[in-house]
From Swiss-Prot:
<keyword id="KW-0793">Thylakoid</keyword>
<keyword id="KW-0472">Membrane</keyword>
<keyword id="KW-0479">Metal-binding</keyword>
<dbReference type="GO" id="GO:0048038">
    <property type="term" value="F:quinone binding"/>
</dbReference>
<keyword id="KW-0874">Quinone</keyword>
<feature type="binding site">
    <location>
        <position position="43"/>
    </location>
    <ligand>
        <name>[4Fe-4S] cluster</name>
    </ligand>
</feature>
<dbReference type="GO" id="GO:0008137">
    <property type="term" value="F:NADH dehydrogenase (ubiquinone) activity"/>
</dbReference>
<keyword id="KW-0004">4Fe-4S</keyword>
<dbReference type="GO" id="GO:0005506">
    <property type="term" value="F:iron ion binding"/>
</dbReference>
<feature type="binding site">
    <location>
        <position position="139"/>
    </location>
    <ligand>
        <name>[4Fe-4S] cluster</name>
    </ligand>
</feature>
<keyword id="KW-0411">Iron-sulfur</keyword>
<dbReference type="GO" id="GO:0009060">
    <property type="term" value="P:aerobic respiration"/>
</dbReference>
<feature type="binding site">
    <location>
        <position position="44"/>
    </location>
    <ligand>
        <name>[4Fe-4S] cluster</name>
    </ligand>
</feature>
<dbReference type="GO" id="GO:0045271">
    <property type="term" value="C:respiratory chain complex I"/>
</dbReference>
<dbReference type="Pfam" id="PF01058">
    <property type="entry name" value="Oxidored_q6"/>
</dbReference>
<keyword id="KW-0520">NAD</keyword>
<keyword id="KW-0934">Plastid</keyword>
Amino acid sequence: MNSTEFPLLDRTTQNSVISTTLNDLSNWSRLSSLWPLLYGTSCCFIEFASLIGSRFDFDRYGLVPRSSPRQADLILTAGTVTMKMAPSLVRLYEQMPEPKYVIAMGACTITGGMFSTDSYSTVRGVDKLIPVDVYLPGCPPKPEAVIDAITKLRKKVSREIYQDRIGSQQENRCFTTNHKFHIERSTHTGNYGQGLLYQSPSTSEIPSETFFKYKSSVSSHELMN
């Protein structure tokens, strides 16, 4: 803005009134203050790490990485999520204050990737655990794609209504799809599953009263046969 534009700006702002709603003001203030919690478990997270450098400079979007979920309003999941990691991911999401958003980055996070076909311990999509706002496919996605996903999330934030978002989250909660597994007793206890096998009692384990009672009840005709 040069010096010739200042008088025009003064004339327009002296008699101008900006009218807005509290919801729009809240959305506008959050557009450039997204604080992400980085949840990376695989190679996709390396592509996100390149955004921190000077070439892409993701600080210009107001992104400030946080190490605590209580200080973050955006969680970016990248990589494979296993069954053992699922409770930790849900716990991190629940500790984030409202409003909060999720970006699923990479094929392994969205669908389980190549590990979902033969693996029994891979979660087939992070949206089965937490609600996802933006899906970012790729193996791995490029840094430009991550910037595009953040731009789309900012557009979604600018148009959303807070009450509608709370209502949709209560209707579409996490754990929508159950993984069908049958829990059985573990046989790797050092006993080689002996508790699961039937063992006939030996003669020494039978009480003497039972043995002589059975012997006296047998007739001589049965003994001859």
